């Protein structure tokens, strides 16, 4: 009994001890949990504090990168006080004592608003993008470095006339002070973790050289492509694919050239032995499987119809509402955020102490008004597409160490180049030069090729365009154009006396004889450049009888004048012809009438393709075979074919044409690419409309590729493909042109970091317009501005452009004006009421 009690007591004590131990363990666990919780809470708040601090710092840095809009700043280089006025859209009016002070103030404003854009321009032509973006840009930089543009820019700066040099120095002072006075570097450098580098005088030259790269071939691509065709195809097939003229030509001198006739021989027998050998022993499909990737994928989409250029036109005072000339201009470029141009007005005293007031568009990186009006003249540009370069076939010795010149064999000049690369060691490359220019590669026969290009000359860039600001008539503008250093453009100019004129503005090479379409040897001295064309010999047209002038990147003149300019790859003349027809449709014009021409989206070019579909494809037999196609016929049976946002018919006819083109030429394109990877279908695609139309109408069976039984089968397959593409995401009735042509206007950094796109990019909207009509408009390509102005009547003028003045997303006018551009509204050419005033004081 006693023993049992002791056992009970023992078990009780043990249980009590165990309970106490468990309780204490629980207490310890709770203490530990509270301790860990406190640690976690502490860490959370520390992280929150760090994130908040970092966010505050980032916010502060971005906010501090905004330009100063009001107040006072003291600038070195000003001779007197200057003011910078901005309206609500950020359009700048600079008022200063003289042109040099305007240059200082312009540099200051450009740096504060657009320095990152300026930086990209100079790095683009210098081949220095890899130091900003890393290894992704090494290949591009290596390609560009062969031009040695930074060295050339430095040389140009040293030999500029004093007046040009003074403006360049003043602008550079303004840029660096504008950058310095930002409280933080432009926000892009924060994202790139890079410090901006100060502006140098040669950087302005590099900015213009970047426009050469944009507007001319930096690699001779088109000439090399034509050279391959000429060496590979029979003469009649080559002429067929490279016609001199077409029904679309609308030259201002009325000159016309016929298209080449359809060759008698089909593709295979018309081709050289080399091309025939390519296909021997292979079925078509085997050949396709072994071909290298299509060059198109490395250039543009095969169906890209973008054509860097522009429209401009003018009417004389005798048919204008103002009595002065009226000039219209829209320059077609790739569009991104911010826009290429920066709007400004300058007010100052000329060197003759006369008041100057000029309004227009500037290019950040340069101190000039590029297009605009000064009360006496108004002017605009389109890309000329003359022949401003030559590819030279080098005759080398056995080991390719020397090349033949008129003076005998000479050694190649090798130059080392170092490419700085962000985040890794620099890359060393070697560029090879000749007396004519850099070596750019080899042709299909293995010959080395050199490149002679006006952009390599010391005359390529100068500040002569500044003189347009004080020109008072068309003749003075012509004289300035002939000595200007810039990518050669079609200058359209009108004055307040009602005169209008066209000429080339920029350097024109003077060749020893007619040549330049295809690569040629210069070894015997027969082919050479003999300096630049004298000013007196520049082609020009002034005051035509009908008081109307127009250009749109196609051939402008013929005969002797054309021989001076050459053909560097003209656009098909459809846009030019439509502008001409619109000008001839009226007897008098005001500014709105000319803007209406700029906004014309009628698809006159595609009318014959519309009729072709209706009469040759959607036949009774074809409709019986494909009953669903009755809807197609109903849709495209419209009397008003236009690239409007709601048009299904336009999208269908347009895409059918492009798919037919690609079906007809695809094997040909692939064969040429196999022979030479530098072959560029993209460079010749516009001229192929002429032979394409002959082929689809004459339908020679021996010109069919890819195993089609007949042309009818090709058209049927192409229409099926077109409809399948259009109905992939919607019914055919809802597959409008606007659904395909949706804007994609982005900041360069948002492409790399999509998350910031909503913050930086313009809204995606459906757009009217397309190629082959005045209203040129693609997803991220089109009219970089539209201007209509009559000199002396600027208050009636019209100007709008995509994106906005600002490059900073927190700017009060970021995106302001973009909607006017989308809708084609007649917004004012002149700045509006002053909203912000900044006073710049001199030391």
Regions of interest found by a model, annotated:
Residues 32-49:
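N-terminal Sec-pathway targeting helices
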Residues 42, 55-326, 331, 337, ...:
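Substrate-recognition/specificity elements adjacent to catalytic centers across diverse enzyme folds
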Residues 484-586, 656, 660-664:
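Hydrophobic alpha-helical segments
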Residues 656-734:
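Charged, long alpha-helical assembly modules
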Residues 102-105, 152-165, 462-468, 563-569, ...:
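Second-shell loop/turn segments in exported
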Residues 348-361, 368, 372-377, 381-523:
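Glycine- and hydrophobic-rich flexible loops that cap the catalytic core of alpha/beta enzyme folds
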Residues 564-622, 715-843:
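Terminal end segments
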């Amino acid at each position: 009994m006693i023993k049992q009690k002791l056992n009970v007591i023992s078990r009780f004590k043990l249980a009590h001890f165990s309970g106490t131990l468990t309780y204490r363990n629980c207490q310890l666990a709770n203490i530990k949990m509270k301790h860990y919780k406190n640690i976690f809470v502490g860490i959370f708040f520390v992280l929150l504090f760090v994130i908040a601090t970092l966010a505050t710092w980032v916010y502060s840095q971005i906010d501090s990168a905004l330009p100063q809009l009001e107040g006072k700043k003291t600038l070195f280089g000003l001779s007197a006080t200057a003011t910078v006025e901005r309206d609500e859209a950020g359009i700048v009016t600079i008022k200063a004592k003289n042109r040099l002070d305007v240059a200082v103030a312009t540099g200051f404003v450009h740096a504060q608003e657009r320095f990152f854009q300026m930086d990209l321009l100079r790095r683009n032509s210098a081949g220095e993008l890899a130091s900003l973006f890393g290894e992704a840009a090494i290949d591009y930089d290596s390609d560009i470095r062969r031009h040695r543009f930074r060295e050339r820019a430095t040389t140009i700066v040293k030999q500029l006339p004093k007046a040009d040099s003074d403006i360049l120095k003043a602008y550079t002072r303004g840029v660096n002070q504008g950058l310095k006075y930002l409280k933080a570097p432009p926000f892009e450098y924060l994202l790139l973790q890079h410090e901006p580098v100060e502006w140098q005088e040669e950087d302005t030259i590099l900015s213009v050289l970047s426009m050469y790269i944009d507007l001319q071939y930096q690699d001779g691509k088109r000439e090399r492509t034509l050279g391959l065709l000429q060496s590979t195809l029979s003469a009649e097939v080559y002429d067929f694919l490279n016609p001199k003229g077409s029904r679309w030509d609308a030259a201002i001198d009325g000159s016309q050239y016929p298209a080449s006739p359809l060759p008698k021989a089909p593709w295979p027998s018309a081709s050289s032995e080399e091309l025939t050998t390519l296909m021997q022993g292979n079925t078509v499909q085997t050949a396709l499987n072994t071909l290298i990737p299509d060059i198109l994928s490395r250039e543009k989409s095969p169906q890209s119809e973008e054509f860097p250029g522009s429209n401009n036109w003018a009417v004389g005072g005798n048919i204008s509402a103002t009595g002065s000339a009226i000039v219209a201009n829209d320059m077609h470029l790739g569009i991104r955020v911010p826009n290429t141009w920066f709007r400004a007005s300058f007010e100052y005293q000329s060197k003759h102490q006369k008041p100057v007031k000029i309004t227009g568009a500037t290019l950040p990186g340069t101190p000039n008004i590029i297009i605009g009006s000064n009360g006496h003249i108004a002017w605009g540009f389109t890309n000329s597409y003359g022949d401003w370069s030559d590819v030279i076939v080098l005759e080398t010795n056995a080991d390719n160490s020397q090349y033949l010149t008129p003076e005998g064999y000479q050694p190649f000049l090798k130059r080392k180049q170092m490419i700085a690369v962000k985040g890794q060691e620099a890359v060393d490359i070697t560029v090879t030069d000749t007396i004519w220019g850099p070596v750019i590669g080899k042709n299909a026969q293995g010959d080395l090729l050199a490149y002679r290009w006006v952009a390599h000359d010391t005359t390529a860039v100068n500040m002569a365009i500044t003189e347009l600001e004080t020109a008072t008539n068309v003749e003075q503008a012509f004289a300035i154009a002939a000595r200007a250093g810039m990518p050669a453009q079609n200058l359209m100019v009108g004055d307040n006396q009602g005169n209008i004129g066209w000429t080339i503005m920029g350097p024109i090479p003077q060749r020893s004889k007619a040549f330049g379409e295809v690569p040629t040897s210069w070894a015997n001295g027969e082919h050479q450049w003999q300096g630049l064309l004298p000013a007196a010999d520049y082609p020009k047209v002034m005051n035509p009888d009908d008081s109307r002038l127009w250009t749109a990147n196609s051939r402008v003149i013929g005969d002797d004048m054309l021989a001076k300019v050459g053909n560097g790859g003209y656009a098909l003349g459809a846009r030019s012809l439509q502008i001409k027809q619109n000008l001839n449709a009226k007897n008098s014009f005001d500014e709105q009438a000319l803007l209406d021409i700029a906004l014309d989206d009628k698809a006159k070019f595609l009318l014959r393709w519309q009729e072709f579909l209706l009469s040759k494809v959607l036949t009774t037999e074809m409709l019986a075979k494909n009953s669903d196609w009755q809807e197609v016929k109903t849709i495209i049976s419209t009397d008003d074919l236009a690239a409007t946002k709601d048009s299904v018919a336009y999208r269908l006819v347009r895409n059918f044409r492009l798919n037919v083109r690609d079906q007809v030429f695809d094997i040909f394109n692939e064969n040429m690419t196999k022979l030479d990877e530098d072959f560029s279908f993209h460079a010749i695609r516009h001229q192929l409309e002429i032979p394409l139309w002959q082929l689809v109408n004459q339908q020679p069976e021996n010109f069919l590729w890819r195993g089609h039984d007949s042309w009818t089968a090709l058209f049927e397959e192409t229409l099926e493909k077109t409809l399948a593409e259009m109905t992939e995401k919607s019914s055919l009735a809802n597959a409008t042109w606007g659904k395909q042509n949706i804007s994609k206007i982005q900041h360069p950094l948002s492409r790399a970091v999509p998350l910031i796109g909503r913050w930086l990019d313009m809204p995606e909207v459906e757009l009217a317009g397309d190629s082959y009509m005045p209203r040129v408009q693609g997803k991220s390509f089109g009219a970089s501005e539209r201007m209509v102005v009559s000199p002396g009547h600027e208050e009636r003028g019209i100007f709008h452009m995509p994106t906005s003045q600002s490059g900073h997303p927190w700017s009060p006018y970021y995106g302001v004006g973009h909607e006017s551009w989308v809708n084609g509204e007649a917004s004012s050419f002149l700045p509006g009421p002053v909203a912000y005033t900044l006073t710049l004081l001199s030391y």
